[in-house]
């Protein structure tokens, strides 16, 4: 398991990432997940955003052979 060091940088808390986890961008988004967080790189420009969107295949979003669940029976408000 890889570890990262947490330290204070002025009034902010910072994380020193191991070399293999370095980001190539200047900013990341911080997403809370349970008791932890997920860091994701933010694109540097709109050009990067559109390039990333172009790389997404519809098969990644809607895989072939995906089955929909049957409709659920629900109690209506009375």
Curated annotation (Swiss-Prot):
The keyword DNA-binding appears for this protein: yes
* This protein's UniProt keywords: DNA-binding, Toxin-antitoxin system
Q: Which GO terms describe its molecular function?
A: DNA binding
- Which InterPro entries would you find in this protein's record? Anti_VapB2-like (IPR047976), SpoVT-AbrB_dom (IPR007159), SpoVT-AbrB_sf (IPR037914), VapB_TA_antitoxins (IPR051734)
This protein's source sits in the domain of life called Bacteria
- Enumerate the spans annotated as SpoVT-AbrB domain: 4-44
User: Does the keyword section mention DNA-binding?
Assistant: yes
* Its biological purpose: Antitoxin component of a type II toxin-antitoxin (TA) system. Upon expression in E.coli or S.cerevisiae neutralizes the effect of cognate toxin VapC2, partially inhibits the RNase activity of VapC2.
Family, as annotated: Belongs to the VapB family.
Assembly information from the UniProt record = Forms complexes with VapC2; probably VapC2(4):VapB2(2) in the absence of DNA, and VapC2(4):VapB2(4) in the presence of DNA. Crystallizes as heterodimers with stoichiometry VapC2(4):VapB2(4) in the presence of its probable promoter DNA. The heterodimers are in contact via alternative VapC-VapC and VapB-VapB interactions. This subunit contacts DNA.
The protein's name: Antitoxin VapB2
User: From which organism does this entry originate?
Assistant: Rickettsia felis (strain ATCC VR-1525 / URRWXCal2)
